[in-house]
């Protein structure tokens, strides 16, 4: 009897562990919700997707350079409460001042930012959302895309638009380009010249055995390498798109550089953001002193909302509406429609082109709307909840046409 009891108890424990594991897996990847919605078909792309390949896009005679800086997990939430954020005192005061001094699109009447929507809440998806105005859907863990021969074969990104208009595209990141299929996407959609962790080793920017137990090399080096590259490419006769992706502020707790000043009233993760704000501010100040600056537009954005609250938003109410940082610097266009906007990652795609002085017939590309135009975004027109619900459903147009190019 005792052996039978132990035998049954073991199986009971196994069943409990399996059920707990399935519960955690579903909580992480929304498997049940995805299964539920994937049995429904959405026509959101048929109704609202504007094919950038067919759109009328006109560049000014004087083509402006673009420096596009994606900061890992940077939120408008990090502003001070008085300026529209959550913090009693801003943990990114320099970036708050940059947003104040330049063009910041806001969800309110103070400083603010934008939503990430389904398929853009992780770095690979965020890059695609920012540059192609569509989400990256599918793949457990959201980073299993290197297995595909191509990624979003029929998408038409800002990199492709710029390359087709005589620009040269560059992408610099401290991490490995192969993670999440980022390198493959950038090569196929804009033929970017990519500088990543492996490039830095191959070209002896860092030692072959360089290791700081992080995602790659640190942002201090990224900004130094970027300065060297910008000086070199600015001497060429072609306009450039130089895009960067930082890594120090990646969760969990970030990478606190040894050169950072530490505020003991802040957590380590808050100190990482505070130090990152100073580093980026210094980099922007350096750009503003360069000869190429007058003909260069700078865009600073967070890639997506922070995936964790530990060490940075632990005292935040569950219903707090977090937004992603944005600042547009040295523009050739003006607008009165910066405040009280409802917008998401997709809208940054046409808005960045407009910031360069590009004219877009209809003011929409893919699922994004040019914010400078004052035209309603899809978030404003349809509502965020409806938009996310439709993006979660199966789309024949997305799967067949956009992803696999069968259209």
Question: Where in this protein do the model-derived segments appear?
Answer:
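Solvent-exposed soluble domains appended to multi-pass membrane proteins
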Residues: 52-64, 68-407
């Amino acid at each position: 009897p005792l052996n039978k009891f132990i035998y049954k108890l073991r199986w009971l424990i196994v069943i409990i562990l399996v059920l707990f594991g399935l519960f955690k897996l579903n909580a992480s990847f929304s498997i049940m919700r995805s299964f539920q919605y994937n049995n429904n078909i959405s026509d959101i792309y048929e109704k609202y997707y504007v094919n950038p390949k067919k759109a009328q896009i006109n560049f000014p005679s004087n083509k402006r350079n673009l420096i596009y800086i994606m900061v890992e997990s940077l939120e408008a939430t990090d502003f001070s409460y008085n300026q529209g954020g959550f913090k009693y005192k801003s943990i990114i005061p320099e970036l708050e001042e940059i947003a104040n001094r330049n063009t910041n699109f806001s969800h309110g009447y103070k400083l603010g930012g934008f939503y990430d929507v389904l398929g853009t809440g992780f770095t690979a998806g965020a890059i695609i959302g920012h540059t192609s105005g569509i989400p990256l859907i599918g793949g457990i863990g959201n980073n299993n895309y290197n297995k595909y021969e191509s990624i979003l074969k029929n998408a038409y990104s800002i990199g492709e638009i710029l390359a087709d208009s005589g620009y040269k595209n560059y992408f610099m990141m401290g991490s490995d380009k192969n993670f999440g299929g980022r390198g493959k996407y950038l090569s196929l959609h804009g033929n970017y010249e990519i500088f990543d962790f492996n490039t830095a080793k191959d070209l002896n920017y860092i030692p072959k055995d360089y290791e700081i137990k992080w995602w790659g090399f640190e942002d201090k080096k990224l900004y130094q390498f970027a300065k060297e590259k910008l000086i070199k490419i600015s001497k060429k006769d072609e306009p450039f798109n130089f895009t960067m992706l930082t890594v120090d502020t990646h969760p969990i707790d970030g990478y606190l550089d040894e050169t950072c000043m530490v505020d003991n009233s802040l957590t380590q993760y808050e100190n990482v953001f505070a130090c990152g704000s100073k580093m980026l501010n210094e980099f922007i100040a350096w750009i503003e002193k360069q000869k190429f600056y007058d003909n260069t537009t700078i865009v600073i954005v967070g890639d997506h909302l922070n995936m964790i609250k530990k060490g940075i938003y632990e005292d935040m109410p569950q219903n707090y509406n977090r937004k992603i940082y944005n600042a547009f610097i040295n523009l050739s266009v003006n607008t009165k429609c910066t405040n009280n906007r409802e917008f998401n990652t997709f809208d940054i795609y046409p808005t960045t082109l407009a910031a360069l002085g590009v004219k877009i017939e209809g003011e929409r590309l893919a699922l994004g709307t040019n914010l400078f135009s004052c035209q309603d975004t899809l978030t404003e027109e349809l509502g965020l909840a409806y938009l996310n619900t439709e993006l979660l459903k199966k789309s024949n147009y997305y799967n067949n046409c956009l992803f696999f190019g069968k259209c």
